[in-house]
């Protein structure tokens, strides 16, 4: 996976199929135009253990529209045809991968132009077989590291591929007004052991929070705030006369979240 160098990464997350497959492609293009460096494409799942209510509702909408793991992966090829050039990470729970078949999953992801995979409910200790497949197919398996994993940070960081995803706080995803005071120390500890870029997600939802974190890590992931914006724009996105204006409003919102990362860093 080729990542930009000498700049903080803006990594947005959206749910495949919310509100539709075609609109997911349009929103991906809008995010690229807004300055996204990597796109996390979430695969809807009926029991999303790591996700809060905003992403759960988005997943329910996508599942109601018959979105599946294979269809979500095929959306990557559609995005490539429409001009999305940034790396795309498939974010999926393990059960759909198991149902499809692990090798089939990696083969399909590679065939359709994905750049990596992230499986939030896959324990690091059980990731060996998938790490072998990720190496064979050239698709990094992105690792998650949480604040409870201090003894395991060095172990997880040593095996990290692509980038290392730090979970800002325990619990599910979702918009948060404040971030833990200990987050800076945690990120510093992870960076000391990591050979790949260190990004942080879960709960980052305002430009002020992005600005606060940019010197402590190599990038931020914003998910629930963007999915919430899509939810607010649902009716307009699905109205022919208002679709383009709604996409432009979404892009403007994403740009405001990325903006602090484009300002000079005080210490990197």
Curated annotation (Swiss-Prot):
Q: What is a GO molecular function of this protein?
A: tryptophan synthase activity
Q: Which PROSITE patterns match?
A: TRP_SYNTHASE_ALPHA (PS00167)
Pfam families the record matches = Trp_syntA (PF00290)
**If you read the UniProt record, what top EC class would you report for this enzyme, in one word?**
lyase
Q: Which InterPro entries match?
A: Aldolase_TIM, RibuloseP-bd_barrel, Trp_synthase_alpha_AS, Trp_synthase_suA
Q: Which domain of life is it from?
A: Bacteria
What SUPFAM superfamilies has UniProt attached to this entry?
A: Ribulose-phoshate binding barrel (SSF51366)
| Catalysed conversion reaction | (1S,2R)-1-C-(indol-3-yl)glycerol 3-phosphate + L-serine = D-glyceraldehyde 3-phosphate + L-tryptophan + H2O
The annotated active site, in chain numbering, is: 40 (proton acceptor), 51 (proton acceptor)
One Gene Ontology term, aspect cellular component: cytosol
Pathway in which the depicted protein is active: Amino-acid biosynthesis; L-tryptophan biosynthesis; L-tryptophan from chorismate: step 5/5
Q: Keywords assigned by UniProt?
A: Amino-acid biosynthesis, Aromatic amino acid biosynthesis, Lyase, Tryptophan biosynthesis
* Enzyme Commission number(s) from the entry: 4.2.1.20
Q: Family per UniProt?
A: Belongs to the TrpA family.
Q: How does it assemble?
A: Tetramer of two alpha and two beta chains.
- Tell me, what does this protein do in biology? The alpha subunit is responsible for the aldol cleavage of indoleglycerol phosphate to indole and glyceraldehyde 3-phosphate.
Record NCBIfam families: trpA (TIGR00262)
Query: What is the protein name stated in its UniProt record?
Result: Tryptophan synthase alpha chain
Question: Which organism encodes this protein?
Answer: Geobacillus thermodenitrificans (strain NG80-2)
Gene this chain is encoded by: trpA
